[in-house]
Design a protein with these regions (language model features):
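Generic hydrophobic, helix-prone segments enriched in Leu/Val/Ile
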Residues: 2, 35-38, 42, 114, ...
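Cationic-aromatic interfacial patches
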Residues: 21-88
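Acidic/His-rich structured neighborhood in mature extracellular/periplasmic domains
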Residues: 59-165
């Protein structure tokens, strides 16, 4: 009987873990507080500084570490603001900027945006559903309305410049 009760408890606990959009989120309390504090701090900046610049500056001095999203045997949303690589830096700065533009101020809102940015179609299925490379990131996120492609169109821009050396 004790064994059956334990199994039921574990099953109910797992429902709670996956209840929020069926996503397990791996984060520290320090990282969740940092998100909320950054979303609060941005309210005091002037309108002259672009949001991505403001948030990017907040990560100066954060160590560059690779493979910070590879935790455990299954894919989950990882929030790690105390170690970044090139892609996670851009993802975090972008997610924070989008939160401000949408008037979001909670860690939960931030996680929803981060999940949409980081995964094909905004859905976590497995390791292969993560946008591992910037070209992939640039293909999927315009469809979500998060970024806009800026290009020269069909013709390449060319100009002649004379240098005096």
């Amino acid at each position: 009987m004790k064994f059956v009760c334990s199994l039921i408890f574990i099953w109910l606990s797992s429902l709670t873990i996956f209840a929020n959009d069926k996503v397990l989120i791996d984060y520290s309390v320090a990282d969740s507080l940092k998100v909320v504090n950054l979303l609060e701090a941005v309210k005091s900046i002037g309108s002259d500084e672009p949001l991505p610049v403001f948030f990017g500056k907040q990560f100066l001095g954060v160590p560059y570490v690779s493979s910070t999203l590879e935790i455990g045997d299954y894919e989950r949303l990882v929030v790690n603001l105390h170690q970044l690589d090139c892609t996670t830096f851009v993802e975090n700065v972008t997610a924070l900027s989008i939160c401000v533009r949408k008037n979001y101020s909670s860690f939960s809102d931030y996680c929803k945006i981060l999940k949409k940015l980081r995964y094909w179609g905004g859905e976590i299925k497995n390791y292969t559903s993560r946008l591992h490379y910037f070209p992939w990131w640039g293909l999927d996120n315009p469809k979500k309305g998060f970024i806009t492609e800026v290009s020269c169109g069909d013709s390449m821009f060319s100009a002649t410049q004379v240098l005096s050396v």
